[in-house]
Design a protein with these regions (language model features):
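Conserved glycine-rich beta-strand-loop-beta hairpin in the small C-terminal domain of fold type I
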Residues: 7-40, 49-60
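Conserved PLP-binding catalytic core of the aspartate aminotransferase-like
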Residues: 47-88
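Charged, glycine/proline-rich intrinsically disordered loops and linkers
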Residues: 1-6
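Generic non-transmembrane alpha-helical segments
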Residues: 38, 42, 67-77, 117-124
Length: 125
C-alpha cells in the first residue's frame, strides 16, 4: 500500500454495509436521545446536563450514590461509576455521580421504571 498511487472504488457490497451501518447508528442515536430526554423530564433535579451530540449515559449527581447503585442493582439495573472515589481524596464529582445507561436496549417503560426507582429511593428510603 505504500506504493499505491490510486484509490479503489468502493464495492457495492461495502456501500450496502455502510448504508446498513448508518441506519443502525441513526436508530441508536434516536433511542438514546429519547431515553435521555425522558429521564431528564423525570429526574431534572438530579441531572448533570451534558453538552453532547451523542449521549452515552444519563449522568446524575446524588447523595448516597453507592447506596442508590446497590438498590438499583437489586432491581437488575446496572449503573457504572465512571468517576470512582479515591481513598484519601474528597471530590464531589467522584462521590456523587452515577451514570444511567440509555442505549437502545432500554424502552420508554424501562426508563420510566428507572426514574421511578430513583425517585422512590430518595423519597421513601
Amino acid at each position: 500500500l505504500d506504493r499505491q498511487t490510486w484509490i479503489n472504488k468502493i464495492s457495492s457490497y461495502s456501500l450496502f454495509r455502510l448504508i446498513d451501518f448508518l441506519s443502525v447508528i441513526e436508530g441508536e442515536y434516536k433511542a438514546r436521545k429519547n431515553n435521555y430526554n425522558l429521564l431528564y423530564e423525570n429526574l431534572k433535579d438530579k441531572a448533570i446536563k451534558l453538552n453532547t451530540n451523542y449521549p452515552s449515559f444519563f449522568v446524575i449527581s446524588v447523595e448516597k450514590r453507592d447506596e442508590l447503585r446497590k438498590f438499583l442493582f437489586t432491581k437488575k439495573i446496572f449503573c457504572p461509576v465512571h468517576w470512582p472515589s479515591i481513598e484519601g481524596v474528597s471530590c464531589q464529582v467522584n462521590d456523587k455521580c452515577l451514570s444511567i445507561p440509555i442505549d437502545s436496549r432500554y424502552s420508554r417503560n424501562d426508563m420510566l421504571q428507572i426514574a421511578t426507582y430513583i425517585n422512590y429511593f430518595y423519597d421513601y428510603k
